[in-house]
Amino acid sequence: MAVGNNTQRSYSIIPCFIFVELVIMAGTVLLAYYFECTDTFQVHIQGFFCQDGDLMKPYPGTEEESFITPLVLYCVLAATPTAIIFIGEISMYFIKSTRESLIAQEKTILTGECCYLNPLLRRIIRFTGVFAFGLFATDIFVNAGQVVTGHLTPYFLTVCKPNYTSADCQAHHQFINNGNICTGDLEVIEKARRSFPSKHAALSIYSALYATMYITSTIKTKSSRLAKPVLCLGTLCTAFLTGLNRVSEYRNHCSDVIAGFILGTAVALFLGMCVVHNFKGTQGSPSKPKPEDPRGVPLMAFPRIESPLETLSAQNHSASMTEVT
């Protein structure tokens, strides 16, 4: 029910947010936790060839020894788009030229009799909430792919340490399905079976593309033509270099990184285009009046002027009719 031109009353927005949105978000976070921190989902044991050169790369060490550690990656992934959204929304709300268009797209929601949700708060919660949901959803997709495929990392044979003197490894072209042939550290071997798709590549491109879509859709700069392209391309380049780092350190195959890029891109495009509608307001742009159909416009009536030829023709026709009768 509308209250004013820029205010709309809604009794369902708060219950929907608490009992629907937060429940879905909590379930997504819980599922991501089970994939990351528990052994609920067992990794598929994939076979290998004992003399496979693609799996004999040197062991690069634990993830904490990588050039891009998981802690740094997750902090940057979460903080960068969130900071961009906060800065962008606050700037647009307090700049007069952009505030008018923002208020035209978003109405202030009145919940109950006293609580107002202004457009600034609604947009920040919407965009950051969707981003967080997509981040956990991407993590779930990646973990599910790694668990189902059990694709081996480039350094798998280095940490597996198979018994090359056994009968199974004597033949160069014999495929080994027995996972018990490995003699290395079981925990390291378990992580070496989770290569496809690359988690670093998927999460980094998702975060970078989501931030890029927000910048290009909402931030308007009339004085500079290169500020937005430099910021967007720099963000995407960082994600691209993150994937290349995984290949250079022999932690993932090229195909793993490409699959991660495709997965993260798909999630970001879906959420950005279909869920937040290119970061536009829920009211949309004000509708323009439709032009009148020219066929429906009444014509101006003019007095009829009878020509002399028509008068003479009518007289001749009446005379001929009289003769016939």
Swiss-Prot record:
Annotated GO molecular function terms are: phosphatidate phosphatase activity
Q: Which UniProt keywords apply?
A: Cell membrane, Cell projection, Glycoprotein, Membrane, Phosphoprotein, Transmembrane, Transmembrane helix
User: Modified residue Phosphoserine is at which positions?
Assistant: 307
Q: Does the keyword Oxidoreductase apply?
A: no
Predominant subcellular localization, coarse grouping: membrane
- Kindly give the SUPFAM superfamilies that the UniProt entry links to this protein: Acid phosphatase/Vanadium-dependent haloperoxidase
Which InterPro entries does UniProt cross-reference here? P_Acid_Pase_2/haloperoxi_sf, P_Acid_Pase_2/haloperoxidase, PA_PP_rel
Q: Please give, as recorded in its UniProt entry, the membrane topology of this protein.
A: Multi-pass membrane protein
- Give the UniProt entry's GO cellular component terms: neuron projection; nucleoplasm; plasma membrane
Location in or out of the cell: Cell membrane; Cell projection, Neuron projection
Summarize the protein's role: May play a role in neurite outgrowth and neurogenesis.
Question: Under what name is this protein listed?
Answer: Phospholipid phosphatase-related protein type 1
Gene behind this chain?
A: PLPPR1
